Amino acid sequence: MATIAIIAATSDRNLVLAQRFAEVLEDDGHRADVIELADMDLPIFTTSHSKEHGAPDDLDALWSRLEAADGWLVCAPEYNGSTPPTLVNAITWLSTRWQDFRALFNGRPVALATSSG
């Protein structure tokens, strides 16, 4: 069966949604890995911060968990007509860490879900 990384971009309704998806997937025999971005130490990305401090330790863990999954499910609310800062920041860190970050994203099935309100 498949391994699905479920990315919870916030720690409220979308985390509950992510946990519910995990239950359903596991009941169907899949492996689910709920990734709580709000609990990860990913400071706001800036070039100066990156040069001065390097990449945060949690970035390696995030990369590994995403790379190990066959597909991703992103649970994120709409924030002011866009995506939440936690999700944008995580993607930004991922895109600056490795020589070919696109290999992590290309060809991987991704689904989106939201609970907003």
Residue ranges and their predicted role:
Residues 2-30:
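N-terminal beta1-alpha1 ligand-phosphate binding loop
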Residues 5, 35, 111-113:
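Hydrophobic/aromatic beta-strand patches that form the interior of the parallel beta-sheet core
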Residues 9-11, 37, 115-117:
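Cofactor-binding loop segments of dinucleotide-utilizing enzymes, especially the Rossmann-like FAD-
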Residues 12, 40, 81-82:
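Short alpha-helical
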Residues 12-19, 52-61:
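Short N-terminal helix-initiation segments at or just after the protein's N-terminus
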Residues 19-22, 47-50, 87-90:
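Short, glycine/charged-enriched secondary-structure capping and boundary segments
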Residues 37-56:
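N-terminal beta-loop-helix "entrance" segment that forms/cooperates
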Residues 54-117:
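Helix-loop-strand module that forms the ligand-binding subsite of alpha/beta enzymes
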